[in-house]
Regions:
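Detector for outer-membrane/organellar transmembrane beta-barrel domains
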Residues: 227-229, 251-365
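Extracellular loop and loop/strand-boundary signature of outer-membrane beta-barrel proteins
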Residues: 78-82, 128-131, 166-169, 208-212, ...
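Surface-exposed coil loops of outer-membrane beta-barrel proteins
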Residues: 120-142, 152-227, 233-240, 314-337, ...
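Repeated loop/turn-to-beta-strand initiation elements of outer-membrane beta-barrel proteins
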Residues: 103-106, 151-155, 189-194, 201, ...
């Protein structure tokens, strides 16, 4: 109870400073879900690569960048005979990237997270989502060779990817990275990408077993994206022995008079089962957002159509659906049933503060056992950007199982506090 009072008070203190003034509409590309907004809070800064004409200066002009992060994450469990759990971790990233010579350069980055035992639960009270069940995690998460020529780029090795069904999802201590072969090409505002993903690691991949395979023979993928006033994404994934997936989203950001921005999107995902994997679905959705004077109001909807004994697969990462929350995504209930999600959110930005509140209603029809699903998640995110380097984020989430009389693993309160420094 004492911990709950402290965390609630901290959220209240941060939120009271948010409503002091107003801010102009931002015309940067809008993010598409609650999860994406939380994900983007602490992305490590990218440093510009130097170009040189000799090998010696490839090393002399190399760039070092990194991130120091500490995080507390605790769950108050409502389910009977399930202990509350919590952990506090310290870690970060350290990256070394060579200067470019004749189009070639290379980079490596270590990601690490270690629980601080004196503020971390033991045994069944331990929260393993920050640093694994062992309380410690270190990986050579990036190690690649890169070649670029004008608007064409090739990269081989462990790298960051952010595509609809494979993304970094930097939402806890360890973000996802991928062992892959990729090629990208830019032409008149269109960005083309193709490649093969062999394995991945990170918070979504299971910290206890890093570098999990992405299909029997990896994942082959290709896509095109465009973002200006109009937005477009069209992607195809062959996740070998699992599913063939076709993804599309498109929409518009239209700035009206009186500082009002309208952001409207639609999306479609079709997955075909391979090798009796059980992954096959059709998902369609829509998003409408209005932004004015630093305030935003949005509503998103997704519908998943599944045959008996099949489920949806949102990919390797946080997922691309408009209704993805901090924790809950449509996959969680779209198994052996049709399901839909409706999410409404309210955001406000003022000076160095950002506020976000979201309410998600997830419902699943009767499955083959005649059981329905109905889960509510509420998220509150409060962010303070002191400058480009230092960030403080407070996230409070709550899930409630509305279908079952007894408390389940979807009944809990979660508080997370992160301090992040980029260098």
């Amino acid at each position: 109870m004492k911990r709950n009072i402290i965390t609630s008070s901290l959220c209240l203190v941060l939120s009271t400073g948010i409503y002091a003034a107003q801010q102009e509409v931002q015309t940067d590309s809008r993010l598409h879900s609650v999860r994406e907004n939380i994900d983007q809070e602490a992305v490590m800064q990218k440093k510009e690569i130097s170009v040189t004409n000799n090998i010696k200066h490839m090393f002399k002009d190399a760039r070092i960048s990194g991130q120091i992060r500490t995080m507390y994450s605790g769950y108050e469990q409502k389910e009977s005979n399930v202990d509350n759990n919590y952990a506090t971790a310290l870690g970060g990233k350290l990256k070394y990237e060579l200067a470019e010579l004749n189009g070639f350069n290379a980079g490596v980055a270590f990601y690490t997270s270690h629980d601080l035992n004196f503020v971390t639960g033991e045994n069944t009270h331990h929260n393993n989502e920050l640093s694994s069940s062992d309380g410690s995690y270190t990986q050579l998460a990036e190690a690649y060779v890169n070649y670029n020529y004008k608007d064409l780029n090739f990269r081989v090795g462990r790298q960051i990817l952010d595509t609809p069904l494979a993304d970094s999802d930097d939402i806890r201590m360890i973000s996802n990275t991928f062992e892959a072969y990729t090629a990208t090409y830019s032409y008149k505002g269109f960005d083309f990408m193709a490649g093969n993903i062999q394995s991945w690691q990170g918070g979504d991949a299971d910290l206890d077993t890093p570098w999990v395979k992405t299909g029997q023979n990896g994942t082959n993928f290709g896509g095109v994206s465009y973002s200006d006033m109009w937005e477009l994404n069209l992607w195809y994934y062959n996740i070998t022995d699992t599913t063939n997936a076709l993804y599309f989203d498109g929409g518009i950001e239209y700035e009206m008079k009186n500082d009002i921005l309208i952001h409207a999107m639609v999306q479609y995902l079709n997955e075909t089962e391979l090798s009796t994997s059980g992954y096959a679905t059709t998902i369609y959705g829509a998003l409408l957002e209005v932004v004015t004077q630093g305030a935003s109001l949005s509503i998103a909807y997704d519908k998943s159509l599944n045959d008996a004994s099949t489920a949806s697969f949102s990919g390797f990462g946080g997922g691309t659906l408009f209704t993805s929350m901090d924790t809950l995504i449509l996959d969680d209930i779209a198994d052996d049933r049709d399901a839909h999600a409706l999410v409404a959110s309210l955001g406000y930005e003022i000076n160095k503060f950002n506020f976000l509140y979201a309410y998600g209603d997830f419902k699943g029809e009767k499955n083959s056992l005649a059981k329905r699903a109905h889960i509510i998640e509420q998220d509150v995110s409060l962010e303070y950007n002191a400058n480009d380097e230092f960030l403080v984020v407070c996230v409070y989430s709550r899930q409630e199982d509305k279908e079952n009389a007894l408390k389940t693993d979807h009944d809990w309160n979660h508080f997370r506090l992160m301090l992040n420094y980029n260098f």
